[in-house]
Amino acid sequence: MSAAGTTKGVTQFHLRHFILRASAEPAIMAKWANNLQELCESTRLGIPAIVASNPRNHVTTDASVGLSVGLTAFSKWPGELGLAAMRDFTLTRKFAETASAEWRAVGLRKGYMYMADLATEPRWGRVEGTFGEDADLASKMITEIVLGFQGNKLSNTSVAMTTKHFPGGGPQVDGQDSHFDWGKFAHYPGGMFDYHVKPFKAAIAAGTSAIMPYYSAPKGKGFEEVGFSYNKAMIGDLLQDKLGFHGIINSDTGPIEMMPWGVENISIPERYKKALNAGVDIFSGAADPTTLIEVVKSGLVSEERINQSVAKLLKEKFDLGLFENPYVNVDAAMKTVGNKEAVAAADLALRKSIVLLRNDDKRLPLAKKTKVYFETYFQSGRNAGGEAIKVSKPNYPGLEFVSTKEEADVVLLWLVPTSGGLFSSQGSKIDLNLSKNRIDVNHVNEVLNAKPTIVAINYTNPWVIEEIDKGKATSIIATFGTTKEALLDIVTGAYKPTGKMPFTTPVNQAAVEANKSDVPGYMEGPGYGLFAFGHGLSY
């Protein structure tokens, strides 16, 4: 994958599409965007730039380059799974409209988002970015997201969406991800290929500006076993001809040089030719266009074919109003990003996203004056020797927070399991037991046996909790990227839980390994699930 500084990209390589992965204060982002547009305006044709980003409005555990920016100055909403857990489509639209306004204020006019993939393979490392395992729910979420960010059509009040990853990245073999050679294949053992396409149909109906194919190659199904960016049957025949999508086909980052699955043995110029013939309009991660220009000059690809893609890219800019006025108001950006109304709406969503899974002893909600020992257990694995346990004593009305378990009437134990993030993968077997995801289950069981305990678990995958579910875990809460304040409002009843599970959690690792990767958990049959899709209690 090539890279170039912004000025060099504009003046030497004539680039006009950029992705901003950094997190900065709104004023800095707005000034940078204006400087970029001023540079573009000074060139021969004055074609404006369009700046894209991955999601940057979510509380997330495993934020990393290419997935999510993580916490920023923008309003902080639940993770995508949490948005789905709300089952509130009006608030979902509010989220999208709010985030769209924040993005536009700093000059971000294109989103590499959202994921229409379905979380049917519980081991997949990108489940956190999905709207769960159910195609109907994901379709409704994607519809509200696209309409909220873009409006009914692209305009100067839109952020253009790039719905991903066609035709659905969920059904990966053994849950391995196709960023890597050992995860290059998607498969459909349950025969549910069409199920995974359904949310993309919703995105198309809502008017998504672009669609991004995944790196994966289809295993079986009679399709050519090449990555979806090279796969004419998937892009040209299915997405464009059958589904009627005529917007931009935006490759994921680096399929030409880094993830050329199925075309490893052909030259880079031939890879460009194959991807263009399949239907790709723009290549992410290819900052230096020299090779692509040679592909055209040599006659491998016609200039007419390139012009078809250029027309789409220019039309998007025209529709967004960038040719009329690409600049933003720095003062307005500072007032818009993270404004009070946005924060209030996000705070409501953070509470609505929380799911009460179990309340067998009716311990919840906690009575006033309860003495609480509040411990968060999170070991990211990125800081060797870092302290996993953090004890919180927030100033929260009605409860008394204490420093030790011994002083407490009840323990609130918030577990944040993590595999270490998608890019920590080395191709080894994926195990969803808590002990394999940086949780000391001996410590958890000691706490459970010592004191009445409320266990909150942050789900970025459908974790297997068998190791701690031995009769003492009678109060369990699911979070999907939220805040301590929101969690405390749930446990006290200041906000009554309303969330519903966006996926099914497997009862044990054997169920995980026996699952059919393209089949949602609620269709796996008896004996698979512990907490079912749609499960959620209240007071």
Whereabouts are the PLM-identified features?
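N-terminal beta-rich core of secreted/periplasmic extracellular enzymes
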Residues: 1-167, 197-210, 227-285, 297, ...
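Gly-rich Lys/Arg/Thr-decorated short loops/hinges at beta-loop-alpha junctions or inter-strand turns
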Residues: 13, 75-79, 121-126, 173-184, ...
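Short coil/turn segments at secondary-structure boundaries
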Residues: 47-52, 215, 287-288, 308-309, ...
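Short acidic/His/Gly/Ser-rich catalytic and metal-binding motifs that mark active-site loops
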Residues: 59-63, 119-123, 169-175, 220, ...
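C-terminal non-catalytic regions of proteins with extracellular/luminal or membrane-system context
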Residues: 105, 259-260, 265, 290-303, ...
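Short beta-alpha connecting loops at secondary-structure transitions
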Residues: 126, 182-188, 220-225, 257-280, ...
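Structured secondary-structure scaffolds
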Residues: 179-200
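Surface-exposed extracellular loop regions of Gram-negative outer-membrane beta-barrel proteins
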Residues: 210-213, 217
